[in-house]
């Protein structure tokens, strides 16, 4: 969702043009909010009383969500959005920054609308508010559920202090194609890991299960699961493109993370832009009602993505906006983001019998229940706390948490000769267009970022070195040779454009003087993210050419690769001795990077996406099905009449789960408590000894994979089923155990039933998806 990307002026221009709300003398009295004891009524009783006083159009208006636009404090009532709120024509607003602006709108809703129903106030708090954490793809590389929960807590604490009560996160779309820009916003290619991390983030945001009637704390906000569903499976990795897949693949590979977040108690769900079974997701009854509500038991409300009801017309399944609104409502969509479809047309649809007032009541009640659970009926201003607004945003405590989390997300891909960590001595050349940029380090979808407060990589290194070494700096290059391409990837986050030859010569000159060269290169923040698909995943031309010149100098070179997706680093892997994938590490990335590259902390991140050797391998993922003609080794050269390519071997450059450390880990033999288990008497444990064989205390991520050898349908070559992030002191050994549960062996069969089938399985444990210890298990 990004408001600037969709041009629907014919829908959004002018006032809402909805039927006038009847104001009879008897209806002017606002609903009672408390019992005689001063406590708010129970949720059902409260909402029953409120809805009994609402007109049909007022109920429909609760289903309307709009961008608030530019609000000036004191003049909000005179704006278009303020006027519509006063008329009771809006249930929520989103993407406003400024407590005073939000309070002004909430004032109008409470004091000027007939029933005084408070607003939902949403924002894309995707990986932080002003304290920005690493992009979600980077966060997943921490494999740290407690850190993920803390990210949600801090994000909610800051957003709620700024007047926000609803975030459009987590995104758990499985993405197998790195060409798709929004891979940056999810948790990678694995359904189990994505579900676990998404659930942890949701728990952090909300602090409560919104399937219950518990009212959230004032420093927590409602989460929104997105994009439901399959958005990450767009063809060719092209934004907003068609999705076409079998239901059996949906159920086994794509839907599990959404279900995990629903089971974690998420309060709302956002529908996706794409087709599902050739029907727009927003109008897909099977997905929105049969799967989401009936099968998974979701109790919250469904909001569309930006203007996606209007986009039903472009998909060609509705003749006009009125029909599109009917399709969306009847499918199970409750709230319309920015199409103005519901608020304009549903009253007429009720009059014509196309939808019923009970359909409207159902959607309205779901939204009012969310407001109740947010505590807005108890205190509409609980998210407008001026004191918290001054103390809880971008605090020293929050910044330290972000710094610590960022350090866990960096993935060390290569470290030839233990070049890293660097010593604080001699002369260090810092070169690259991303070394001294302030507004790119936070990454895409940093809506509320305050870059003027952030520290660049250059500034952080100067502070970390503290005179112990000399830091030499040169930008070195533009992002692209083509200025138009650079503008496309900036989206307002600019990097100075300079003379290519002059910048290159400056970089080569300081490199000659230096003992070691550190290169900060790669993508800008918005070369990944929404509407940022790429057909070539290699480092942009002019940067790679500079890197090649630096590599020829015979000096030690460290590449800090900035990216919002898996990129192609085949040339770099061959020629650069040390490579660290640093993604976009958020507001504190400068200090966090210095913690790691100078050795105060040890890198522990592991990839949650397979990194390709070439763009032509995409989509690329570890948990694929076998073919009838497999190659025995993913990295073997071409074999005739086998499933492979002429020019590149099948395997990734770096596999899923991979990441190096400043120490080494040794895995002993894998042991099972039994090699046979009966379905009616299930107890099986896998154990393995892991030893830190290096000289540094460090974290390791121990990964459990399972393969179903023979089943009624073809099963993946391996699937992640568990992991443990452990800390081992230098020389320490520990026995790690995994309970193998029946749930780990279940899958959806051809009848879409969730089953365990007896047979043979491989149990695998290791430090990444390629290097594993294996034992066999038979289920009877």
What are these model-predicted stretches?
Residues 20-746, 755-769, 775, 780:
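Glycoside hydrolase catalytic-domain context in secreted enzymes
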